[in-house]
């Protein structure tokens, strides 16, 4: 009987479970829709929709499997941390961290908050594997090579390189302005080149090295990848954050020493480029002549030799590691000329449209013959009425535009069609490299979040730290070299940290303090904190100077600089009815006592002067500016009285002698002490 009762209860229990699950189907669908938007869901949110006490474990596992197949991650609710500004940073098991918006347990509603939208979109980008990083790095390299190859076909590039070579020889510019010094030197070290040139060069480490110069070749290669803290001899943890600039200054070689080692090799490469391009220019002329004459005189062997020489020049230019600013200048020059050509093309097309020439027909007849001197004669001989109208009504305008195009062709040194092809190749390479860099940056944005949150409460807001870290990330993408073997995240970490710490040093304080002084302040603060624990009180400047082996005057100067500014609106007193600014003396304002003395002196002088003759009184008033806006010179007073300046001087001296008489002067001595 008991067994029968138990059997009777089983269907009811299953029915209850099925009913409970059926009632939650709408909530499950809503949960799946929200999770698809966010890309993840927490265990707590899953339990809120499907409580474990009412839903079986098998059903929960089925739902979790379904979520996994949809690409939705199920994460632990306890791992969600809320950071500054309301952003939530969810830490994963790897070295990177996933940033999401909102707080734990918050409903996943749509939002138009730009910060949350940024974090949501950032979290939707998949992380890159080592193979994915290499693939993108190769795409960046291929795009750059395509761009450089296009630049190497333009005579303007080699004109600029020749100018740079001459300026380097005459020392008008520095080597660091032409090439990427750290990348070139790092490549030389990897190939065991350039070390010979370093022998005998004593280059002091540059203190306060500029960020652009000191952030150098592969910082990750010189630093441990571990984030474990280091300890000093007393067992106290050493703050890496405060000492990063010190490490950079001590590990980076002097820029002058690098330039001295690389300059001979760079000049030699520039000479090779100039020599090879002289040959290439001759072959370009022959190739262009063969194309224009359509006689096929440029043989297959000559074309192969042309392509081989062109590839050699591209390799030489790539070895130089030209500075990005120089490459951008060359590209801007090409694009500027291309805009000029497009403007001329637009003018020609407008004239053709006005003459009712079919646009496609006109472009077919125009393109490729921009520099052909016989083009106008051939086109004007066409029997079509539209072409006749063009040259009857707009011949002078067409001639002017053709003349402008000829000037452009003479300047660029190649045929216009060839120049268009060069520009298209440069644009293609630039676009490919830019797209690959964008993908690399987007895939590592959450790495910036994970690093930036460790630097909060240091004077910059969290979003500002993210922004600065993103700038460092973009620089890391530009300088990353996958052939060195380390992962991009390891390499980018130090660039991001350096960008964030440098921005904190530059922007955190209301009054900017130089980076080298920030380092000294941090060192002083650390020592002061250590001595506070040792002696139980704040150390005196003398004790700090002795501990740091630093001059006392410098310690006092650093302590004075380290003081934070305070607001003039800071409340003063218990009732807080006054502000700090109310107690600051205005150096430009007249004190009430001085104002009273001046007014009394003015009244006394006014009573004394009438005892003189009217002429003497007026001369003194004009000479000393009494009762007037300004004083006057002897010449100006003489012109007023129509007498010489000598006569005015005599009248002034006589009047002053009269004022010294006791009958008049006894009223004035009391003002002499004021």
UniProtKB/Swiss-Prot annotation:
Motif Interaction with polymerase core subunit RpoC location, chain numbering: 464-467
Induction cue: Expression is constant during exponential and early stationary phases, and increases significantly in later stationary phase.
Region (Disordered), start-end ranges: 216-252
Gene Ontology molecular function: DNA binding; sigma factor activity
Coiled-coil stretches: none
DNA-binding residues (ranges): 634-653
Any one annotated GO CC term: cytoplasm
Alphabetized UniProt keyword annotations: Cytoplasm, DNA-binding, Sigma factor, Transcription, Transcription regulation
UniProt family annotation: Belongs to the sigma-70 factor family. RpoD/SigA subfamily.
Function of the molecule: Sigma factors are initiation factors that promote the attachment of RNA polymerase to specific initiation sites and are then released. This sigma factor is the primary sigma factor during exponential growth.
Name of the molecule in the record: RNA polymerase sigma factor RpoD
Organism: Rhodobacter capsulatus (Rhodopseudomonas capsulata)
Source lineage: Bacteria, Pseudomonadati, Pseudomonadota, Alphaproteobacteria, Rhodobacterales
């Amino acid at each position: 009987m008991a067994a029968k009762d138990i059997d009777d209860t089983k269907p009811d229990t299953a029915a209850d479970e099925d009913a409970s699950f059926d009632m939650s189907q709408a909530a499950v669908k809503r949960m799946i829709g929200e999770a698809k938007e966010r890309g993840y869901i927490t265990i707590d949110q899953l339990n809120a929709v499907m409580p474990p006490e009412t839903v079986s474990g098998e059903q929960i596992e089925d739902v979790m499997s379904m979520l996994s197949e949809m690409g939705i991650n199920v994460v632990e609710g306890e791992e969600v941390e809320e950071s500054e500004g309301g952003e939530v940073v969810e830490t994963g098991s790897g070295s990177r961290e996933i940033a999401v918006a909102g707080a734990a347990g918050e409903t996943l509603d749509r939002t138009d908050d730009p910060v949350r939208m940024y974090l949501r979109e950032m979290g939707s980008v998949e992380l890159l594997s080592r193979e994915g990083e290499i693939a993108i790095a190769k795409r960046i390299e291929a795009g750059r090579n395509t761009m450089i190859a296009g630049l190497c076909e333009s005579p303007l590039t080699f004109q600029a390189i020749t100018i740079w070579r001459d300026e380097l020889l005459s020392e008008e510019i520095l080597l660091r302005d032409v090439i990427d010094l750290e990348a070139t030197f790092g490549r030389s070290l990897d190939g065991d080149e350039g070390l010979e040139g370093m022998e005998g060069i004593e280059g002091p480490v540059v203190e306060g090295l500029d960020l652009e110069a000191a952030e150098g070749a592969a910082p990750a290669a010189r630093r441990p990848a571990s984030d474990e803290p280091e300890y000093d001899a007393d067992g106290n943890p050493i703050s890496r954050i405060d000492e990063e600039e010190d490490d950079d200054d001590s590990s980076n070689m002097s820029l002058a020493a690098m330039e001295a080692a690389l300059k001979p090799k760079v000049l030699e490469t520039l000479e090779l480029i100039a020599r090879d391009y002289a040959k290439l220019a001759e072959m370009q002329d022959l190739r262009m002549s063969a194309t224009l004459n359509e006689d096929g005189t440029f043989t297959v062997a000559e074309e192969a030799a042309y392509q081989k020489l062109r590839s050699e020049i591209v390799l030489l230019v790539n070895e130089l590691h030209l500075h990005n600013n120089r490459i951008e200048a060359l590209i801007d020059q090409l694009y500027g000329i291309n805009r000029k050509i497009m403007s001329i093309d637009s003018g020609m097309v407008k004239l053709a449209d006005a003459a009712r020439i079919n646009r496609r027909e006109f472009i077919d007849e125009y393109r490729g013959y921009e520099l052909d001197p016989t083009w106008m004669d051939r086109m004007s001989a066409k029997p079509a009425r539209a072409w006749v109208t063009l040259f009857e009504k707009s011949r002078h305008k067409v001639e002017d535009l053709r003349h402008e195009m000829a000037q452009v062709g003479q300047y660029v040194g190649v045929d216009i069609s060839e120049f268009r092809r060069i520009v298209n190749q440069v644009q293609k390479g630039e676009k490919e490299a830019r797209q690959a860099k964008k993908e690399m940056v987007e895939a590592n944005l959450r790495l910036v979040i994970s690093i930036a949150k460790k630097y909060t409460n240091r004077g910059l807001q969290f979003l500002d730290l993210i922004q600065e870290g993103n700038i460092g990330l973009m620089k890391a993408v530009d300088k990353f070299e996958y052939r060195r073997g380390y992962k991009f995240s390891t390499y980018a970490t130090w660039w991001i940290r350096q960008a964030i710490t440098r921005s904190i040093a530059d922007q955190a304080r209301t009054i900017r303090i130089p980076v080298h002084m920030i380092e000294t302040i941090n060192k002083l603060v650390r020592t002061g904190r250590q001595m506070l624990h040792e002696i139980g009180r704040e150390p005196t400047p003398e004790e700090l100077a002795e501990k740091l082996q630093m001059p006392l005057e410098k310690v006092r100067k650093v302590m004075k600089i380290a003081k934070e500014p305070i607001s003039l609106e800071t409340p003063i007193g218990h009732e807080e009815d006054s502000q700090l600014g109310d107690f600051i003396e205005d150096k430009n304002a007249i004190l009430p006592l001085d104002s009273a003395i001046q007014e009394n002196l003015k009244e006394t002088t006014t009573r004394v002067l009438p005892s003189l003759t009217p002429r003497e009184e007026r001369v003194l008033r004009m000479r000393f500016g009494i009762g007037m806006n300004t004083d006057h010179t002897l010449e100006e007073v003489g012109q007023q009285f129509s007498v010489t300046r000598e006569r005015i001087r005599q009248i002034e001296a006589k009047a002053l002698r009269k004022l010294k008489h006791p009958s008049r002067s006894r009223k004035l001595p009391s003002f002499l002490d004021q």
